[in-house]
């Protein structure tokens, strides 16, 4: 516990909260170019081949982003939009690619939760 004199000499410093999505720089979404599209395996109790992409953003930062939904059309040099939102079982993946914008197609034959996957209303 500091004395009054110590507090006068040097005031208390507020603890800074760590940002969950630093690469977005307080923007809701950001545009970027895919540098590598690949699959990776999740952490321990789960087993799958999760689709992810390395994305170089317009601000120069390179991040790993998850590609949600079944099937995708992304490849190297695809222009994508990313949003915040981590994938719990993939360490280091803190961003999601927005489906149905720029070069990313929406999910085919999606009937429920369509707005999250950029799918048009079925006829």
UniProtKB/Swiss-Prot annotation:
Organism in which the protein naturally occurs: Nitratidesulfovibrio vulgaris (strain DSM 19637 / Miyazaki F)
Protein name: Small ribosomal subunit protein uS12
Single annotated GO MF: rRNA binding
A family per Pfam: Ribosom_S12_S23
HAMAP family: Ribosomal_uS12_B (MF_00403_B)
Residue(s) carrying 3-methylthioaspartic acid: 89
UniProt record similarity statement: Belongs to the universal ribosomal protein uS12 family.
Basic residues compositional bias, start-end: 113-123
Region feature (Disordered): 104-123
Subunit relationships: Part of the 30S ribosomal subunit. Contacts proteins S8 and S17. May interact with IF1 in the 30S initiation complex.
Annotated function: With S4 and S5 plays an important role in translational accuracy.
Record keywords: Methylation, Ribonucleoprotein, Ribosomal protein, RNA-binding, rRNA-binding, tRNA-binding
InterPro entries referenced in this protein's UniProt entry, alphabetically: NA-bd_OB-fold, Ribosomal_uS12, Ribosomal_uS12_bac
Biological process, per Gene Ontology: translation
A GO cellular-component term linked to this record: small ribosomal subunit
């Amino acid at each position: 516990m500091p004395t009054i004199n110590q507090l006068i000499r040097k005031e208390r410093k507020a603890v800074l909260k760590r940002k969950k999505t630093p690469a977005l720089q307080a923007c809701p979404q950001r545009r970027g170019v895919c540098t590598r599209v690949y699959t990776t395996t999740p952490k321990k109790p789960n087993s799958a081949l999760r689709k992810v992409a390395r994305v170089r953003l317009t601000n120069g930062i390179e991040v790993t982003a998850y590609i949600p939904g079944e099937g995708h059309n992304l490849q190297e040099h695809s222009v994508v939009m990313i949003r915040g939102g981590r994938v719990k079982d993939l360490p280091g993946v803190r961003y999601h690619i927005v489906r149905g914008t720029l070069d990313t197609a929406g999910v085919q034959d999606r009937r429920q939760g369509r707005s999250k996957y950029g799918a048009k209303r079925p006829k």
